[in-house]
């Protein structure tokens, strides 16, 4: 088993080395792709846009992103995936020859296990939701036309171009091996396809959101404690990242498994609070919600406010405080874009109801 994994990892190292040597001029492009593919952009950019254009699509997009990333965390704890940037320095596979020289970048040194790729899984799931939802909107109940078939081909072609760029980016940056990004894409598509058949997320009560959030948190913590009791150190990757990363400032606490867990759960719970608030009912369910300029204003205001909000970084000196603030900050994202901003805009534009939450 170990010999087979070494061969697989060596193929990944050779792939990374080949890309870095032959596509040096594409360095900025691959870094940009990796930054754009970060799941944070699904919450801060794609979610508010889709929610105010097609509410159901926005809700599904957020659920797929959150549950997909939660499953990604569990998979990583089970699979113990290596990352190229530390494996090539730790392995004795190259004891009889020189190891390929692998370059590191500011976005290389993530601290969690490597398999499956979170960037690939998140991008695949989120973009799968957008493509299938767009096709469903344009098709309706009519028989597919020639224009629709062309749109279908163009969207799926664009989907796979995006996935290819994300996968190549993660390999180029030495953040993942090829098999990890492939596993991420397939897992993301599976999660998104599953949520195409789940209708209960669109009218879930606050109690349901609370219970699901508690279950996801309890399961993750319980699973972590169980593995720790069995003698498994689930924070083994943090030590490797700190030891093998070229620069200490490139190791970020917000890429640890628990940071990801609490950010996702905060986002999900925040969505539940927002959708079950009176501010949401009075603004997004009122007459103004059908007026396109109002929805467009909500999108623009959400993007501006969330961009400013994203620039606020919780202090990371004390991990517990960092995790709590990360949860609260993430919960505020859907609260702002779903209820607070539409309510304020509706109030400014003369919406008759002026009750608070």
Curated annotation (Swiss-Prot):
Xref: InterPro entries: Glucose-6-phosphatase, P_Acid_Pase_2/haloperoxi_sf, P_Acid_Pase_2/haloperoxidase
Cellular localization per UniProt: Endoplasmic reticulum membrane
The keyword Endoplasmic reticulum belongs to this UniProt entry's keyword annotation: yes
Residues annotated as glycosylated: 96
UniProt keyword list: Endoplasmic reticulum, Gluconeogenesis, Glycoprotein, Hydrolase, Membrane, Transmembrane, Transmembrane helix
Spans through the membrane: 29-49, 61-81, 118-138, 148-168, 171-191, 210-230, 255-275, 292-312, 321-341
Predominant location category: endoplasmic reticulum
Lumenal topological segments: 1-28, 82-117, 169-170, 231-254, 313-320
SUPFAM superfamilies: Acid phosphatase/Vanadium-dependent haloperoxidase
Amino-acid positions noted as binding substrate in the UniProt annotation, renumbered to this chain: 83, 170
Gene3D superfamilies reported in the protein's UniProt record: Phosphatidic acid phosphatase type 2/haloperoxidase (1.20.144.10)
Stretches in topological domain Cytoplasmic: 50-60, 139-147, 192-209, 276-291, 342-357
Primary enzyme class: hydrolase
GO cellular component: endoplasmic reticulum membrane; membrane
Recorded metabolic or biological pathway in which this protein acts: Carbohydrate biosynthesis; gluconeogenesis
PANTHER family: GLUCOSE-6-PHOSPHATASE, GLUCOSE-6-PHOSPHATASE CATALYTIC SUBUNIT 1
Function: Hydrolyzes glucose-6-phosphate to glucose in the endoplasmic reticulum. Forms with the glucose-6-phosphate transporter (SLC37A4/G6PT) the complex responsible for glucose production in the terminal step of glycogenolysis and gluconeogenesis. Hence, it is the key enzyme in homeostatic regulation of blood glucose levels.
Family, similarity comment: Belongs to the glucose-6-phosphatase family.
Official protein name in the record: Glucose-6-phosphatase catalytic subunit 1
Organism: Bos taurus
């Amino acid at each position: 088993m170990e010999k087979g994994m070494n061969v697989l990892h060596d193929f990944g190292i050779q792939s990374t080395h080949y890309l870095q040597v032959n596509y040096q001029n594409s360095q900025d492009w691959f870094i940009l792709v990796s930054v754009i593919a970060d799941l944070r952009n699904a919450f801060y950019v794609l979610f508010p846009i889709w929610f105010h254009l097609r509410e159901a699509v926005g809700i599904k997009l957020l659920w797929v992103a959150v549950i997909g990333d939660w499953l990604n965390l569990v998979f990583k704890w089970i699979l113990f995936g290596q990352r190229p940037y530390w494996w090539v320095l730790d392995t004795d596979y190259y004891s009889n020859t020189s190891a390929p020289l692998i370059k590191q970048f500011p976005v290389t040194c993530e601290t969690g296990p490597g398999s499956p790729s979170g960037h690939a899984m998140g991008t695949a799931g989120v973009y799968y939701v957008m493509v299938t939802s767009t096709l469903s909107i344009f098709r309706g109940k009519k028989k597919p036309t020639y224009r629709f078939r062309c749109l279908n081909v163009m969207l799926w072609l664009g989907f796979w171009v995006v996935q290819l760029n994300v996968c190549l980016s993660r390999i180029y940056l030495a953040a993942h091996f090829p098999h990890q990004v492939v596993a991420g894409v397939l897992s993301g598509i599976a999660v998104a396809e599953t949520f195409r058949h789940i209708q209960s997320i669109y009218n879930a009560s606050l109690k349901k959101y609370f219970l699901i959030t508690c279950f996801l948190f309890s399961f993750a913590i319980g699973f972590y404690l169980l593995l720790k009791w069995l003698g498994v150190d689930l924070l083994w990757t943090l030590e490797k990242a700190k030891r093998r990363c070229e620069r200490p400032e490139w190791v970020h606490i917000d890429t640890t498994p628990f940071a990801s867990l609490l950010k996702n759960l905060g986002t999900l719970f925040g969505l539940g609070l927002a959708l079950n608030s009176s501010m949401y009912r009075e603004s997004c369910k009122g007459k103004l919600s059908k007026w396109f300029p109002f929805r467009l204003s909500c999108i623009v205001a959400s993007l501006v406010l969330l961009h400013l909000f994203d620039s606020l970084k919780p202090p990371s000196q004390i991990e517990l405080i960092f995790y709590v603030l990360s949860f609260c900050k993430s919960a505020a994202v859907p609260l702002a874009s779903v209820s607070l901003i539409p309510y304020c805009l509706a109030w400014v534009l003369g919406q008759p109801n002026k009750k608070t939450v």
